[in-house]
Swiss-Prot record:
Gene that this polypeptide is encoded by: infB
Membership in a protein family: Belongs to the TRAFAC class translation factor GTPase superfamily. Classic translation factor GTPase family. IF-2 subfamily.
InterPro entries assigned to the protein according to its UniProt record, in alphabetical order: EFTU-type, P-loop_NTPase, Small_GTP-bd, T_Tr_GTP-bd_dom, TF_aIF-2_arc, TIF_IF2, TIF_IF2_dom3, TIF_IF2_dom3_sf
Name the record gives this protein: Probable translation initiation factor IF-2
Annotated Low complexity bias: 11-29
Annotated region described as G4, given as residue ranges: 158-161
Annotated source species: Haloquadratum walsbyi (strain DSM 16790 / HBSQ001)
Amino acid sequence: MSDTDADADTDAVSTTETSMNADANANADGDTLRTPIVAVLGHVDHGKTTLLDTVRGSAVSEDEAGAITQHIGATAVPLETVSEMAGELVDPADFDLPGLLFIDTPGHHSFTTLRSRGGALADIAVVVVDVNDGFQPQTIEALDILQRTGTPFVVAANKVDTTPGWTPTDGSPIQPTYESQPSAARDRLDERLYELIGDLSDEGFSGDLYWRVQNFTKNVGVVPLSAITSEGVPDLLAVLMGLSQRYMREQMAIDITGPGAGTILEVKDERGFGATVDVVLYDGSVRPDDIIVVGGTDGPIVTDVRALLQPRPNAEIRTENRFDRVEIAQAAAGVKIAAPDLDNAMAGAPLRVVRNRDRANVVSEVEAELADIAVETAEEGVVVKADTLGSLEAMANALKEADVPILRAEVGDVAPRDIAIASTANEERNQTVLGFSVDVLSNASDELEESNVRLFTDDVIYQLVDEYKSYVDEQERAQQETVLDKIVRPCRFRILEDHVFRQSSPAVVGVEVLSGTLKNNQYIIKWNGNEPARIGELSGIQEQGEDVSSARAGTRVSIAIDGPTVGRQIEEGDELWVELPEKHAKILEQELIDEIPADELEALTSYLDSHRKRDPFWGK
């Protein structure tokens, strides 16, 4: 993309020159305490978006001099505004951290997007849980990833205002509004909160209501609140500021003048700029004309920054003139970067500013981070697509735990090439594409209809893996049933007394099936000591005068046997067996033993025991 192209659409961006960061407090020695980065997670419809909107809306309504700044993919709330919203719960004099930066990633269903240098991009997280629903699949998935990355978190027990009998007090801290409620409402809420704390315990976390927690490094604080009425939101902000100040202050000390480091949240085409990346910057700074290195689908991309963009205040996202240019972005901040050659940049990948460093070293740094999350692949396996690099890593971990091999794994929507690759798998179970939080391109849908490839998509990783495993289990059962239909099944039966209807050509006798399954067109044997003697072939079965193809244990039927004569080779009262080919006996014992009924297993065991008395290795 040329310089001319980058500036072609003058309506798309304001020429206002400003700088942006989420406010920062400089120390006397020049070090700066950056804003802690907060991720808000939760199951669909549990209120995470409403909570973010409430934080934004409340902060805007305060109309303070240090009012919030809307970043790309993030919302910065300065300490003064936090104090106004939290009231007496937050005294600015007690804090030297500059505020909070809430990451806002609509469309991103997984916290896995938010990674940096092998850990979590967020310094602290809020897990939003509907007190009425408790933990749901995405809640559990979020907790699992938070645990893996070692990210501290609090639980926002949302929708307390839906408690029967609750009378809301908008914007109030939770304890005063709780105390003002009728006892029945308090009791009902207590019950729900203790159930939620029990859910935490079930997932391996010790938790309690936040004001009862003495040590937040060992226990998870639960903050009851309502994103709709803002009750308890002051408490949440106070807890986030308090935890950040007490436990993370040293981690927040950075040099904001140094070369920037960040994580790509999203790759988007913007009119007048082409492909752009939305980035959360967690260290240093970035300026127009900086050379940057970003992670791409084919390796690191080296390019130069043409423009830094932030949303215009109160601008509708659909309007053309919706961005302001900024002259510098400093951590912590969310910023849109316009630069050439970003089409293959990956969401979740690292971004580094070169500036006064050796370019080759920075490229190696990005390569190393990409290699750190490279997915282990096999010669035979499934195709995996995910929305971000972090999601891909989490998918690969989940599939590895489930012993599912991966042939190919990439970031991006499902494309025709993915269907073509999956169709080359030798095993039917591997002719599969697993897509996490991705769309299917229309031409890929067409190819899918014409192929034998199966596609599974979901926004919850473990549900996606479980769905695939269920499919494989069904396939295996179907294959086993097919094998069982084709294989000779063990059966022991006895000729009934006074039930000889014809002596020979064929012999027709009444029998009782003692164990196993009797089927037509199978050879029949009689044991003489340890020696099996084939006496004929079963050519017909009748039950109550009707022809049938098989008879199970416990039934009495009449059968026709070609070959023997009653009174010579067989007698009334004789015990006879279906002859099992040795190969079939081996398959039944080694592969299908869990699939056959108990009586059939009994017949198989007896049959094998008889053979192995004369040949210990028969059927092995």
